[in-house]
Amino acid sequence: MRVFQRSTCRMPVSRATVTILLGILFGFSITYYLTALKSLTNPIICGPEQQIGGFDYLDVISQRADADVFTRSQSLPGHRRGLILVAIMTAAKYVDTRAYNVWKTWAQHIPGRVLIFVAEGTESVHEDMPLIRLKGVDDTYPPQKKSFAMVKWLAENMADEYDWFLRADDDLYIRGEELALFLRSVDSSKAHIIGQAGLGNSAEYGLLALGSTDNYCMGGPGIVMSRDTLLKVSPHLESCLQHMLTSHEDVELGRCIRKHVGVACTWNYEMQKLFHNNQSAIKESYAKNMKELKDAITLHPIKDPAVMRKVHLRNREIKLREARAKRSLLSSELSTAKAQTLVRMTPNRTNDLTPWEYINNNKILFCADRVNCPRHTVDLSIRTEMADTITQLFDEFNTNARQRGRVLQFQSLQYGYMRVEPTKGVDYVLDMLLWFKKFRPPNRTTISVRRHAYVQQTFGKLRSLSEGVFRSNMRANSTLIEDPTLHMIMPLRGRAAIFARFAQHLKSICARGGDDLAVSLTIVLYSSEDEMENRETIEMLRASFIPVTVIEMGDVSFSRGVALMRGAETLPANALLFFTDVDMLFTCDALKRIKSNTILNAQIYFPIVFSEFSHESWSENDKLLADAFHYGRGRGYFRHFGYGLAAMYKADLMDVGGFDTKIEGWGKEDVDLFEKAIKNGRLRVIRVPEPGLVHIYHPIHCDENMPTAQKDMCHGSKAASLASIDTLVEQIAQYT
């Protein structure tokens, strides 16, 4: 056994060695002290007179005094950089539209900071936007100078603050959570430039002075640069700007980075999905189909602010769905959770059974107890929900696909069943065709298989919210005060007896409505043979202390759209308008629901009215009923295709564009207004069956000289109002 003992020998240390060590220690101390002192004495806000950098045409300037936004900090010990800074380029004509829309949507969900770069002298009415004004830069297109100046500003002011920098346009949508997840998987200490690689379109291919193996990151879908890339390219921006070979700023930025940093854009096929660029139909990009959103980090181009808000809402829905699914999964793992079962409710009676609806190849729906049953085209809402369900289903299937060495891909839906349990959720039985792929050697194979999937979507917990809190939240941005009076606007030409019935009914409603139901009536009166009788009825209403305003139209062609707009023009912007017809009867509760379902600057109400069939088709029991407020299958139907009755505030009517006053005669003006309200994007449209609104049957006469679209609508409404399907079947049965 060998024993090791500590030596007692000491090596002599010379005086020169000690002096060198002390000098090194003293030098480090002085350097640290001077660095810290410099960081304290340097200005942190770029004032109007301060130049950044050495080039006049690349100098940049900020005139907003927000120290949190424009901080030039040094890397102090323990300083931790943020993840990403998004730099958005925009022009003066878009700063208050596209740029502000971006700032209010996806920019609020970026895990870092967002700055908006504009030309020198650009002003905005929105003080909350973080604008950076670039000195000596204008809105000349192509924006090479603006792009290079922005990159230089980032390098000299923000390089020590963030690991990643994203150059973006004002028509780009970014999913912040997915961007953060992607960037945290990449080493930020190395030089990177990430985006969708491009070589130019078909007209420019071969004309961009690119080498056989060169590419560039397309500017539209966004360009991500690491901090190292930004610092290395910054000193060479002046030279690159003076020696451009094309007019495309993204091509030249990529060329400059490739030359002086030595990295090129990520040449990866998957980047086409992650940084998605829609080149097929720029004007309608993502307006209808947003299937690319699920797999994308960025979407480009979205030039319409309404579409941008729609895409943002869809993205938040996806995140909410994921959060709910995670909550449901965690809840199911609790020891107190109920065991999962396909039978969520045991019916006690036959009427408690919820019928299943059959879906044939995702195109035809066979249903019961719904509108247009038993067979009709699958609604867009159902198609969208099923697509989301299938996508989520396969995402869960493929969670551990790499470890298992196999992946499942959806092909098509053969058929399916669906039912809605009102207190539980939605149940699906889906027969699907899918690809089963094994990608791990030596058993690589692809097989087409058919499988059944049983899917349950569970509703979230009920929440109660008072009407006062709800309305105050919805109208938080409104500067107008809602008028409590319900202003009914009604065009009238002839039909004295029908108008007398309407007036008598309105008189009785107002008599028992109480103080909380203030109603006024605006009549847009056209000349007719029985005009004097109508005027006598108007005086009777005025004698009943009902405010009545008459707008004289004279002997001109009847146009419902023109009449309703004339009536609305006489009222203030905060007036609650209810467009109605002389054939309508209503209850006091219906008028109160109209008031509660209409919110200024937030919500428009299109009630679905109950329309009577021809009285000749009624059964004897229906004819014996005293009033109109009964709802049998043979008595009438809820007119889902009619939009003539609507409630909204005048400010919202003008915001959506109002009625089309070029339409003459009967129909189409209501459909046009409804479509405008839907496309507006800012206002929510609520549409529900309203049992308190009943349209009394009257013979419909369709003028054959009407435009084709109006004539088809008129004939369709006339046919639908003759009798119920049950009555028609009984009539046919007599001849079989």
UniProtKB/Swiss-Prot annotation:
EC identifiers of the protein: 2.4.1.174, 2.4.1.175, 2.4.1.226
Subcellular location: Golgi apparatus, Golgi stack membrane
Glycosylated residue positions: N278, N348, N443, N477
Keywords linked to the UniProt accession: Coiled coil, Glycoprotein, Golgi apparatus, Membrane, Metal-binding, Signal-anchor, Transferase, Transmembrane, Transmembrane helix
GO molecular function terms listed in the Swiss-Prot or TrEMBL record: enzyme binding; glucuronosyl-N-acetylgalactosaminyl-proteoglycan 4-beta-N-acetylgalactosaminyltransferase activity; glucuronylgalactosylproteoglycan 4-beta-N-acetylgalactosaminyltransferase activity; metal ion binding; N-acetylgalactosaminyl-proteoglycan 3-beta-glucuronosyltransferase activity
Topology term for the membrane: Single-pass type II membrane protein
Role according to the record: Has both beta-1,3-glucuronic acid and beta-1,4-N-acetylgalactosamine transferase activity. The beta-1,3-glucuronic acid transferase activity is controversial as it is not detected using the purified recombinant enzyme. Adds the first N-acetylgalactosamine(GalNAc) to initiate the chondroitin chain. Transfers glucuronic acid (GlcUA) from UDP-GlcUA and GalNAc from UDP-GalNAc to the non-reducing end of the elongating chondroitin polymer. Together with mig-22, required for chondroitin synthesis. Plays a role in early embryonic development by controlling cell division and cytokinesis.
Entry protein name: Chondroitin sulfate synthase sqv-5
Organism: Caenorhabditis elegans
Phylogenetic classification of the source organism: Eukaryota, Metazoa, Ecdysozoa, Nematoda, Chromadorea
